[in-house]
Amino acid sequence: MIKMMALLFKKPGLTDEEFKSYWKGKHGALAGKIIPGLRKYTQNHFIKLPGSKYEGDGFVELWFDDLEAVKKYLAWRQTAAAQPLLEDENKFLDRSKTVRYVVEEYFIIK
């Protein structure tokens, strides 16, 4: 499987708790239902420790069968069918700062 990861930044004006609550609740349910070809969906909410520097507010992991499925997902994001997801993202994300990575995992220790 191929994984797409994205570093997410909360929308200005939201508290950490508002961001996490919306992402985990409403958006998580929507993403799980609407994203085509999605095999697994994981949210990683940052635990911000005192004295540590953080870029962003969380990582999302989306698993797909192969690279073609990732490409189809990215193309889908440009269609009208993706509008409900994109509109929902605008409620809690600063999408202009999102950074995406497509990776292949290699387990070294399991």
PLM regions and their residue ranges:
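Macromolecular interaction modules
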Residues: M1-K110
